[in-house]
Curated annotation (Swiss-Prot):
Name of encoding gene: rpsI
Official protein name in the record: Small ribosomal subunit protein uS9
Keyword check for Ribosomal protein: yes
Key words, A-Z: Ribonucleoprotein, Ribosomal protein
InterPro entries in the cross-refs: Ribosomal_Su5_D2-typ_SF, Ribosomal_uS9, Ribosomal_uS9_bac/plastid, Ribosomal_uS9_CS, Ribsml_uS5_D2-typ_fold_subgr
The species this protein was found in: Rhodospirillum rubrum (strain ATCC 11170 / ATH 1.1.1 / DSM 467 / LMG 4362 / NCIMB 8255 / S1)
Length: 158
């Protein structure tokens, strides 16, 4: 580099490499769908989205039938609310492993990733809300000499 950068103001003036300035291309298959995988705890969600009327199908069942708790449905719809695309995409997904809460989190992660593949301009909004990051928290393993991961057996003084 011929120019020497001494401050952050100088850094702004330097142009970013051409590879970073390229616009991301949408990833869609022949049917116009975008595919992504979402994970949370032990749950894995395979998600396909396409432009549609807002219908969400989970393992061949409607969203309201598969996730009866309103909180879980709210978690799943968060990516659409953040990107202002409610009722604009049809979602077909298969979810395996874990419980309902983990599956809902995996579905949210998968929908967020699929939305960014469908339209890369949605990525900053989803990333700012933290939907693009896989939640690393999992169940802590049980240790020997203990009742559970951290719970000790009852102590008897005598």
């Amino acid at each position: 580099m011929a120019e020497e950068i001494k401050s952050f103001e100088d850094l702004k003036d330097v142009a970013a490499p051409a590879a970073l300035q390229q616009k991301r291309e949408p990833k869609r298959d022949a049917q116009g769908r975008s595919y992504a995988t979402g994970r949370r705890k032990d749950a894995v969600a395979r998600v396909w989205i396409k432009a549609g009327s807002g219908r969400i199908t989970v393992n061949g069942r409607e969203l309201e039938n598969y996730f009866p708790r309103p909180v879980l449905r709210m978690v799943i719809n968060q990516p659409f609310v953040v990107t202002n695309t409610t009722n604009q995409f049809d979602v077909v997904c298969t979810v395996t492993g874990g419980g309902l809460s983990g599956q809902a989190g995996a579905l949210r992660h998968g929908i967020s990733r699929a939305l960014t593949y469908f339209d890369p301009d949605m990525r900053p909004a989803l990333k700012a809300e933290g939907f693009m990051t896989r939640d690393p928290r999992t169940v802590e393993r049980k240790k020997y000499g203990r009742a559970k991961a951290r719970r000790s057996f009852q102590f008897s003084k005598r």
